[in-house]
Amino acid sequence: MFAKINHLAICTTNYAANARFYQALFGMKASNTQRPARAAPVGDGQVGLNNIPLRDGRRSGLDHFGFEVESIPLALERMKKFDPNLPAVQRPAVRPNAAWSAADHDMIIYDLAERDSGKAQDIFAENTGGELPRRYINHIALRATNPERSAEFYSTVYELPISNDRSGGSYRLSDGRVTLLILPWKMENFVGHDPEPPRLEHFGFKVESIEAVKRDLEEIAGTNPVMVTKPLGLGAEGKARLAVLKQCPIGQLQLTDLEGVHIDVNDH
């Protein structure tokens, strides 16, 4: 395929512990090249999940995602043809895993890396696909003001086919392994809790068993009190936030990581 989703980034003060959480619960792998003072990336064979130290003035939580593409010049050409006003900037050479950063019409940020460029480092060079692991990232979810236009954009520019499944008013596009789920952004979703702009909302894992994940989550928290996730659905606002997360037609069990990033899992 022309493009595949290869990158997610979380900004967190607990970047090292958060990376260990994803290793412990979901079996993600750390890079063979460790850089203790830098971000802590882990991978599932395709997606590199980068846990980034939170800097001043930056918002914590799920930050952006990224594509690996056959040709960055062609992707940029298609993007400008689709909408000349869409922004894209070339990144400094010190960030080899994200040659360019761009945004869709809702200003949802994503990175671009070119396949076989020889520039990938750390987990992004070590993610080589192969046999599906027992637990792996199988969808990322965006909230968009115009889901149909967003789906058209990602399909036209990145050749992600659009599924006929429109459950929950969503659009599903796939690179063959990871689904890009585009959900409608509605102000009505925020009547009971603080409003959020259109954004990268959550991501989810395909697992072998929901019950096994529940058992592992309890065992991990009992073994290591640092790895206790944020509570979901507590209080009126918590219930309202959880109700929005449950609008995802793929997720069956909802939880968070140590930073409070929303995750869901499915075994169907």
Functional labels for PLM-detected ranges:
Residues 1-19, 62-65, 115-151, 179, ...:
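N-terminal beta-strand motif that seeds the catalytic metal site of vicinal oxygen chelate
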Residues 24-31, 83-86, 156-163, 221-224:
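Conserved acetyl-CoA-binding loop of GNAT-fold acetyltransferases
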Residues 26-61, 102, 109-117, 161-197, ...:
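Conserved short beta-strand elements that form part of the metal-binding/catalytic scaffold
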Residues 15, 35, 94-95, 147, ...:
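Short strand-connecting beta-turns/loops that link adjacent beta-strands
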Residues 18-23, 79, 107, 150-155, ...:
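Conserved active-site tyrosine of GNAT-family acetyltransferases
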Residues 4-13, 41, 55-133, 172, 218-268, ...:
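Vicinal oxygen chelate
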